[in-house]
Amino acid sequence: MEKTLGLEIIEVVEQAAIASARLMGKGLRNEADGVAVKAMRDRMNQIYMRGRIVIGEGERDDAPMLYIGEQVGICTQPNAAQMCSIDELLEIDIAVDPCEGTNLVAEGRQGSMAVLAISEKGGLLGAPDLYMKKLAAPPQAKGKVHIDYPATKNLQIIAECLDRAIEDLVVIVMKRDRHKDLISEIRSTGARVRFIDDGDISAALSAGINGTGVHALMGIGAAPEGVISAAALRCLGSHFQGQLIYDPDVVQTGLLKGTKAEIEEQLKAQGVEQPDKVWEAEELASGKNVLFAACGITDGDFIKGVRFFTGSARTETMVISSQSNTVRFVDTVHILDPAHHASLVI
């Protein structure tokens, strides 16, 4: 999978990032997402693959493109058997977030990326569009921290694993009312809190990569993004756990319809037999071969955003593979207008 699709998925996230970055700082949140979705889908449909969106822009009735269940790739066409090889006809699952952090792009702030993860069929959990409690931590803490532990205990463990004082730790938390108690607990240990308003895939990666200055992600965010984060951190050998949160009183957004009991019954009817299960990264992204790619739209902790020059653009992409146990950073210059070759900046 990596040999046949590795370069292709790089180009998929690059095209989405370039399209969205054109609208950076213009206050056009929905438009920045829309152009990224279209660019990502267009490039996917040029690839010799048989892909199925398992995490995307929503249900079919709510999303015109990259909706859950959509088939993408040349090898989904009726005459695919005549055009595609046996390997290309194998089904793959795809999880996408073409513009992770739409508000960040609209406001010209750091941390937005175009991301996707792929695996063989059944290799990525199709998480319901609910919330998820998440814990991400560096590789040294994998299997030692636990999402059920108090934040105090987890920070003590992380500090010991990294051989540093708790006061040296930085924890990313999404700035939401539901996290008031969590924030107070983190601060009581002496650790520092870094708030984000959006983009917790980027935050999970920052926690899972040594040297970013971030040592944990804690709190509740969107469940689909949790699966994509799990795919990346599983490939990195870092710690990630997630647990569905479906109690409206806990998430405090007003977006969940019905009571906790009603939503629990809906989940069970959809086949989620253990709604309160704690999911490990290896369960959320269980495939034998998992590939993750992220291209910066705006600058982040580990990759730069898109930079535009006369007739060209430069992107930075991170590609992580469970198959080859590699993390690659790809620096690409895109000639957007051949008439301006002389203006190329390296």
UniProtKB/Swiss-Prot annotation:
What reaction gets catalysed by this protein? beta-D-fructose 1,6-bisphosphate + H2O = beta-D-fructose 6-phosphate + phosphate; D-sedoheptulose 1,7-bisphosphate + H2O = D-sedoheptulose 7-phosphate + phosphate
Q: Does the keyword Membrane apply?
A: no
Required co-factor? Mn(2+)
Q: Which CDD domains match?
A: FBPase_glpX (cd01516)
Where, if anywhere, are coiled coils annotated?
A: none
Enzyme Commission (EC) number: 3.1.3.11, 3.1.3.37
Gene Ontology biological process terms, A to Z: fructose 1,6-bisphosphate metabolic process; gluconeogenesis; glycerol metabolic process; reductive pentose-phosphate cycle
Question: What Gene Ontology molecular function terms does this protein carry?
Answer: fructose 1,6-bisphosphate 1-phosphatase activity; metal ion binding; sedoheptulose-bisphosphatase activity
What Pfam families is this protein classified in? Answer: FBPase_glpX
Q: PANTHER family given for it?
A: FRUCTOSE-1,6-BISPHOSPHATASE 1 CLASS 2-RELATED, FRUCTOSE-1,6-BISPHOSPHATASE CLASS 2
Which positions are annotated as binding substrate?
E100, G101, T102, Y131, R176, D177, R178, D198, G199, D200
Determine the domain of life of the protein's source: Bacteria
Subunit comment: Homotetramer.
Q: Pathway involvement? A: Carbohydrate biosynthesis; Calvin cycle
The entry's keywords:
Calvin cycle, Carbohydrate metabolism, Hydrolase, Manganese, Metal-binding
Q: Where on this chain does Mn(2+) 2 bind?
A: D97, E100, E225
* First and last residue of the signal peptide: none
Task: Briefly state the protein's biological role.
Answer: Catalyzes the hydrolysis of fructose 1,6-bisphosphate (Fru 1,6-P2) and sedoheptulose 1,7-bisphosphate (Sed 1,7-P2) to fructose 6-phosphate and sedoheptulose 7-phosphate, respectively.
From the Swiss-Prot or TrEMBL record, give the protein name.
D-fructose 1,6-bisphosphatase class 2/sedoheptulose 1,7-bisphosphatase
Residues the entry annotates as binding Mn(2+) 1: D33, E57
What protein family is recorded?
A: Belongs to the FBPase class 2 family.
For the protein in the UniProt heading, the enzyme class is: hydrolase
